[in-house]
Each structure stands twice: as structure tokens, then as C-alpha cells.
Amino acid sequence: MNDERVFGITTGTAATAAALASLLCLKGCEASKVRVRTPSGILEVDVEYVERISGDTARACVIKRPYPDPDVTVNLEIISTVQITGTPEIMIRGGEGVGIVTKPGLQVPPGEAAINPVPRRMIEENLREHLRDDEGAVVTVSVPGGERIASRTMNPRLGIIGGISILGTTGIARPMSTEAYRESLACQIDIATARGFRELVFVPGNIGERFAREYFESIEDERIIQMANFPGYMLEEADGRGVERIILMGHAGKLIKLSAGIFQTRSSDADARREIMAAHAALMGASRDTVTRIFNDGTVEEMISELEGEGLTGRVFNSIADAIRERFNERFSFDTDVLIFSLDGRILNSNFKTKRNHRFTEVF
């Protein structure tokens, strides 16, 4: 089960292992490895250090070891301090470097430490095996450097402040897995719908978000949803959560892929930008030479320049926006509007309804 060359451990497993090592120390066993019960089975986890602080308190550290994944939490120290109490309750708290939830809609309510339900259960179940019926514990999880690392995660966007989240659903971190990242993206929708928002602005990333903020006279932060390279997944999640209208905004380079039904937009998986642009240019009457140049251009911005030379920019991007709406109507039940931008912030299509002073609908 345990192969550090292939899998890593989640921050939840690291926190659980550190808590278990702390408790075992208080029970008279100082362990350099612990066996942690996880949803995926038993994992053996190395303990960096464990120390007794007082008669009823100990702390231990587990390092989140590297594995084949660009995980920003790799090499962080996950420290759990355990104090045995005389009541059967196990309380779990966040310390230094563990974020605090500030917005409704996540798995943890506002005001609580960002330690998700599965890690909380793992800590409780693993400790309970070694506590008497009349004993409980206070567990404080801390992550030195967690606040600094958190700026490189989705936490600031999700309203989790002051540190990282203690996460995990299986106990193991799978290399190059997109599942956890997609789930963190979908949390944006949970936060928006928890506020009663049923009309959202979907953007590919930071450039699209900048366009949205500059375009609308007034818009709440939570209403702008970043899709990254997973528009299909994110749009399905929105549809399943009762979102009624989506305004799609972003740079042409990302959005035109949706017009061809490409709902996973990472270039290494699917590109087709030149084929899409050449096809719509030809449909709108571009000359053969222009279509050929578009097909051979290296960037979408160059393709836009070719269209401007023939005065076809608006017609071509109206055609692309229509194709996007058609694709969305085939798959989703919400209403859609589309605004396609160039890198310098110009709107390339004109067949949209959403104005700058748009009043968003809400359901409470």
C-alpha cells in the first residue's frame, strides 16, 4: 500500500500521524513510524520527531515527503500537539499556519480551522483506539510556513485566511492527479451559491477575471468563478448546483476551444485554435489567403490581426460566440451569455446581452 516513489500522503494523513505519535508518546511508546488507519487502508508514516512537553501533553512532527507531483505542501512540517483530557471528547483545533474559514459554502463552517471532515475523522478514529473510555484529547495542528505557502493555493480565493488547509479524502496523495485541484475549484461555486447567487461569471483564469472586474461597474468577488483548464467539469458542477445563468468571459485563446466542444482546454490535451479560427473565418467570407495565413499563424492575437485586415473581426467572433452557446445548450440547462476579449481588453463579439451596469439576479 505504501510506496513513496508513487504516492504521497495528504496533509490530513500527516496531521493524523503526528497526532498518533504524540499520543503514543504520552502512553509510553516513542515511535519513529506509526501505522495510520485511512479510508484507503493502513499507511506506515515516518515521524520526524516526537517530544513530551508535560505530563499530559506531547507533540510530534511529520514531514510531507516529496512525490511525483507539483504539490506546494511538499516538505512542509505538519505538527500535531496532543493534550490528554479527563472527558471523552476529542477536540481538534488549528494552530500556526492552518487557515481559518471565513465564508459559508465549504465543508467546514466559517470561524473554524480549515481542517476538513475526513482528516478530522481520521484523527479522532486513530486516537480513540489508544484512549480509555474516560479519556479525551485536545489536538492542535500547526504548519510552520503555512501562511506563506497558502498564497500559492486556492485558499485566498476561497476565503480561507492565515494558512493552508488540512485536506484529503483517501489519505494518499496521487501523483499528477487533477481530482483535488478540480474539487478546490468547485468550492468557488459552493461559496457563490451559499450566498444565494444563481447568476455567475465564469472565466478561464486571472486574465478573464481582470476583464470581468474592469467590465462590470459592480460585481462581488464570489460571483467570479475561475475554471482553469476544466470548463466542462466546472460547468457541470454549476448546472448540478442550480445555477441559472452563466456569463462566460475571457481571452479568445481559451474561449474559442469551447466553440468546438473542447471542454478540457489544456493545450497538451487539445488545441485546435487555428482550425477553429480558420473555419469560422472561411464561413464568414474571408479570402483564401487570409484563411491560409490564419491557419499558419502562431498565436490567436496574430489571427485577430488578420481578421481586422479584412474587417471580419466582429462577424467571426459573433459566429464563435454563437457556436459556444450552441455547445452549452446541448449539455447544460442554464442560460449563457458570451463576451470574448483580446489581450488588450477589447470585446471582439457584439452578440451579447450583458451590459456594464448589469444587475445580477439573486435567490435567498
Curated annotation (Swiss-Prot):
PANTHER family: COBALT-PRECORRIN-5B C(1)-METHYLTRANSFERASE. Its EC number is 2.1.1.195. It comes from Methanothermobacter thermautotrophicus (strain ATCC 29096 / DSM 1053 / JCM 10044 / NBRC 100330 / Delta H). The gene is cbiD. Keywords: Cobalamin biosynthesis, Methyltransferase, S-adenosyl-L-methionine, Transferase. One of its GO terms (biological process) is anaerobic cobalamin biosynthetic process. The lineage of its organism: Archaea, Methanobacteriati, Methanobacteriota, Methanomada group, Methanobacteria. Gene3D superfamilies: CbiD-like. Coiled coil: none annotated. InterPro entries: CbiD, CbiD_sf. This is Cobalt-precorrin-5B C(1)-methyltransferase. It is an enzyme of class 2 (transferase). Pfam families: CbiD. Pathway: Cofactor biosynthesis; adenosylcobalamin biosynthesis; cob(II)yrinate a,c-diamide from sirohydrochlorin (anaerobic route): step 6/10. Belongs to the CbiD family. It catalyses: Co-precorrin-5B + S-adenosyl-L-methionine = Co-precorrin-6A + S-adenosyl-L-homocysteine.
